[in-house]
């Protein structure tokens, strides 16, 4: 199969088309900023909903005594309308990783495979996939003392740290989640996000402000037409 031609917009950044994750994110942000319009998102009532409709396993009894937190797509339901995702991701300190796996195995969970990053994909007795991520992030200790709860009462990563993770990801879905969550965040929450990003990834501040702009623009009420 012939390779796709590299579009001129991308070729100006990476002639061979091999964008870094940060370059890829910048291209997406630039396109969105050119196209975003007030009120292009869902209704305000829908956007305010926080639900826990999807029945993810409750790991609290199994992992009692160990610090853990939900990350990934399931975590976003604490900050925006719930969306479908194929599995539940949890983040634990790498020093607790083997203990977490052992506790889950004792509860009937099975290891499917190793993850591309440090950790394991596991399957619950009901067939639900759980990705157990062993974390060594410089912000991990701070994050674990600033936990939030989702509508089901499960421990969820705080918004600033979820933004850090999703901004470092390579999927457009992650960046869409970021702009939506930021668009729905309060001024106080945005200042908390800015402070954490400035501390841990200051090189991402410009992109963060762009994603805030896009998210807030989508939440604006469109102008009425006579």
PLM regions and their residue ranges:
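Compositionally biased terminal segments of proteins
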Residues: 2-226
């Amino acid at each position: 199969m012939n390779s796709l031609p590299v579009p001129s917009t991308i070729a100006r950044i990476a002639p061979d088309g091999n964008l870094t994750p940060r370059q890829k994110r910048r291209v997406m942000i630039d396109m969105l900023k050119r196209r975003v319009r007030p009120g292009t998102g869902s209704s305000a009532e829908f956007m305010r909903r926080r639900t826990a409709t999807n029945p993810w396993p409750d790991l609290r009894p199994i992992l009692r005594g160990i610090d853990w937190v939900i990350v990934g797509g399931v975590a976003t339901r604490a900050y925006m309308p719930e969306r479908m995702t194929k599995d539940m991701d949890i983040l634990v300190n790498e020093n607790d990783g083997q203990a977490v796996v052992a506790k889950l195995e004792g509860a009937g969970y099975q290891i499917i495979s190793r993850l591309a990053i440090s950790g394991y994909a596991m399957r619950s007795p009901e067939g639900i996939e759980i990705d157990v991520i062993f974390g060594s992030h410089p912000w991990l200790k701070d994050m674990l003392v600033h936990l939030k709860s989702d509508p089901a009462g499960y421990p969820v990563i705080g918004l600033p740290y979820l933004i850090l993770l999703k901004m470092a990801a390579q999927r457009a879905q992650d960046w869409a989640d970021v702009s939506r969550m930021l668009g729905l965040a309060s001024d106080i929450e945005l200042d908390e996000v800015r402070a954490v990003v400035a501390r841990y990834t200051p090189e991402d501040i410009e992109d963060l402000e762009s994603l805030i702009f896009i998210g807030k623009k989508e939440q604006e009420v469109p102008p009425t037409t006579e």
